[in-house]
Amino acid sequence: RVEVQEQRPVAKWQEKSWLSPQGEVLVLPHSGGLKVMPKLNGPDGMAPTVLSRFRQWNQLLNGVGLALNALSRTAVGTWNLNVSSFQIGAEQDRDFELTVSEVEADFRLGRFIRLYSQNNEEGWRQQIRRIDLRYPNGMAVALNQPLKPSTTE
């Protein structure tokens, strides 16, 4: 008796594998017909953890009009997120990078989300290239172009 169990990948894992909804690594002989999926990466054995974080953080980011396209975890515990805007009325999707350490990762990502959702007077959101959230009391923001100085009357 032979049993066949269908596997539906939910994410790309590293360069040549896929992940099941449970975070199991799948090696597929032919994957040309698969739709574009999030790209996840991390040390061997970390696939379930990376997938869990992806789901958690993508849901948080979706709440402010952002989508998590790719997530990777380094061996030393740094998380790199590739994020894009999907806000209605935006001229185009804008990708940018977020970096956060394992230490207080949820708190620091939450701090970014609060700032992002509350403040766009200077149009800075459209200029984000990279944000480093590894600082205990703030974040470093790299912009594509410098903002124009605000003038007060």
Give the location of each predicted region:
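Charged, solvent-exposed interaction patches on well-folded alpha/beta domains
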Residues: 1-153
